Amino acid sequence: MMDVEQVKEIIPHRYPFLLVDKVVEIQEGEKVTALKNVSVNEPFFQGHFPEYPVMPGVLILEALAQTGAIAVLNIEENKGKIGFLAGVDKCRFKRQVKPGDQLNLQVEIIRMKGPIGKGKGIATVDGEVACEAEITFAIK
């Protein structure tokens, strides 16, 4: 388990773009489960949408990418490096995410070849799938 301060030691993201609050389970280089508490105070809710606040789908996807980055950047040989989003496949948004929701973020690394890898991510709220995608990343 990692709190947000420990997460910040692994990935370079910071407010307002750090989208992982806590890691609840990690298998280095293989699998990570993390949480994002979605607050009404998130800066994106000011414009998306003031009368009907919904977390932008691309930010749910980014939260999954950050979760996957934790899995691979926590490996000793990758510490201090940065993970870059290189591609997205089979992405589907199935549920809106609103203030007060807790995103459960699960990413399993399904392939690594040198600095390029792919992860399968699923974001859920109360057991319902909000987003699923295959995420390709590059480590530099």
Swiss-Prot record:
Residues forming the catalytic site: 48
Major site of localization recorded for this protein: cytoplasm
Keyword match Cytoplasm: yes
Entry EC number(s): 4.2.1.59
Reaction(s) catalysed (UniProt annotation): a (3R)-hydroxyacyl-[ACP] = a (2E)-enoyl-[ACP] + H2O
Subcellular location: Cytoplasm
Highest taxon in the source lineage: Bacteria
Any one GO MF annotation of this record: (3R)-hydroxyacyl-[acyl-carrier-protein] dehydratase activity
Keywords on record: Cytoplasm, Lipid A biosynthesis, Lipid biosynthesis, Lipid metabolism, Lyase
Gene Ontology CC terms: cytoplasm; membrane
Coiled coil: none
A GO BP annotation: lipid A biosynthetic process
UniProt cross-references to SUPFAM superfamilies, sorted A to Z: Thioesterase/thiol ester dehydrase-isomerase
Annotated disulfide bonds: none
Enzyme kind, highest EC tier: lyase
Gene3D superfamilies registered for this protein in UniProt: Hotdog Thioesterase
PANTHER family noted in UniProt: 3-HYDROXYACYL-[ACYL-CARRIER-PROTEIN] DEHYDRATASE
UniProt family annotation: Belongs to the thioester dehydratase family. FabZ subfamily.
Protein's name according to its UniProt entry: 3-hydroxyacyl-[acyl-carrier-protein] dehydratase FabZ
Organism: Oceanobacillus iheyensis (strain DSM 14371 / CIP 107618 / JCM 11309 / KCTC 3954 / HTE831)
Gene encoding the protein: fabZ
